[in-house]
Amino acid sequence: MNAFLLSALCLLGAWAALAGGVTVQDGNFSFSLESVKKLKDLQEPQEPRVGKLRNFAPIPGEPVVPILCSNPNFPEELKPLCKEPNAQEILQRLEEIAEDPGTCEICAYAACTGC
């Protein structure tokens, strides 16, 4: 009886993980773990564009949009956070999870649910 119950719980957990997937939450934002994992691929160093871009000081009071948000491969699901004034901080936290998604898949981070 106990073995049957344990097996049923394991199957139910596996089904829930496949059906709903793991959700990463940061403040009012919720994202699928799959979208967060895509950030790792975007972090790869890109060739510097010498002479094309110049560093300008940000205008006070204007939000600073992280460079990552302008990447054409940036996940659609994450784009709403680019409009937030603290987008860079949120992206840094999500990038930490993207670096080691296994700990999120076992719900080691409080921000991860749906394991």
UniProtKB/Swiss-Prot annotation:
Disulfide bond positions: 69-82, 104-112, 107-115
Leader peptide range in chain numbering: 1-21
Family: Belongs to the guanylin family.
Main function: Endogenous activator of intestinal guanylate cyclase. It stimulates this enzyme through the same receptor binding region as the heat-stable enterotoxins.
Keyword Cell wall biogenesis/degradation recorded: no
Expression sites by tissue: Highly expressed in ileum and colon. Found in plasma.
Coiled coil regions, renumbered to chain: none
Membrane-spanning ranges: none
Main location: secreted
GO MF term list: guanylate cyclase activator activity; hormone activity
Pfam families assigned to the protein according to its UniProt record, in alphabetical order: Guanylin
Name recorded for this polypeptide: Guanylin
GO cellular component assignments: extracellular region
Compartment(s) of residence: Secreted
Lineage: Eukaryota, Metazoa, Chordata, Craniata, Vertebrata
UniProt entry keywords in alphabetical sequence: Disulfide bond, Secreted, Signal
Keyword Secreted: yes
InterPro entries tied to this protein: Guanylin, Guanylin_sf
